Amino acid sequence: MPSVRTWNILLSAYAIQGDISRAKHCWRRMKKSEIRPDIVSYNTLLNCCVKSFRIRKKRSRNSGNIEEDVEFIFKELMHDQDVLANHITYLTMINFWINKKKTKRAEQFLLKVIQEHKKSNNGVMKISDSKILFPLRSLFHKVMTGWLITKKPENAEQLLLKMTELSDDGFDGLQPNTETYNILINCWAKSNKWESGECAEAILRGMEGLVSAGKEKVITNRDSYNFVLEAWSNSGGDISLIRIEKLIREMVSLENPGVLPDSDSYELWLKTIAASNGRVDKIQKGKEVIMMMKTHNFCPNGDIRRKILLLSDS
C-alpha cells in the first residue's frame, strides 16, 4: 500500500503543473485508501490551488470554484485532529487571497488565526505548546504588501498598529521593525496620493523617535529615506522638490554609509526637478545635484548622467 509520502509526491507533481482536478482526484483516492494526510499533503493541495489560479489568470481563463476549494481544504485541515496547520499553510492562504487582489480577505484570515489561537488557549497568547500556531511577523508583512499593491496605505497602517497592540500584549515576535515601517512608507510612496510625501516623512520621523526611546529594531536605513523621497516625488507640488533636497542633504550629513544617497535617491531628485514648473532653474538644480554627489564621492551611472544632460537642454 502506498505511504503518505508516496501520495504527497503525486500531489506535488500535480501542484507543480497547477492541475487542481488531478490533485483533487489523487486526494480522494488517498483518503479512500485510509491513508491519513499530513500537513505536507494539505499544504501541497492548497499550493496547487494557488498555482492553478495563477495559470488560469495568465491565460485569461475563469478561475472556477478555486476559492471554494481553498476554503474547503483549509476547513478540513482545521477539523483534522491529527494535523496542525503551520506557517507554510498560513502563507499559502495569504498568497492566494493577495493574488486574487483580495487583500481584505487575506487580512481577515490572518486576524482569524489570531482569534482562534487565543480561543484554543483560553484567551491567552502562547508562543509554543499551542493547538494553533501564532502567525509570524513576516505574514503581517505579506498582508501589508498586499495593501501596497492595492494602494491602500491607511489599511497597512492599521495593520501595523495591530502588530504593536499584539506586541504590547506580550507577543514580542510581532513587534514592528525597520522592514515593517519601510513597507508602510513604501505603501504611501506607491499610493500616489497628494498627501503621501507628508505622511511618509511623518513615519520616518516617528521611527527616529522610537529609536531615541530605545527601540533599536526600527532604525532608519537608506530604503526608509528612498521611499520617503519617492513619496514626495509622487506627491507633486512645489514643496516636493524642497523636501527632497532637504532629505538628501540630511542623508549625506548623517555620514552613515548605510544611509548615503544612491542611484535611486539621485534619480528621484532628478525626476522631480524635471517635473518642476518653469520657475525652477533646472540647469542650476542639475549643478546642485552634481555638487551633492561630489560631497560623498558618488559616481553616477549612465542613466543619471543622461538625465542631468537633459536638464541642460530643457
Where do the model's predicted regions map?
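Inter-helix linker motif
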Residues: 34, 81-82, 117, 132, ...
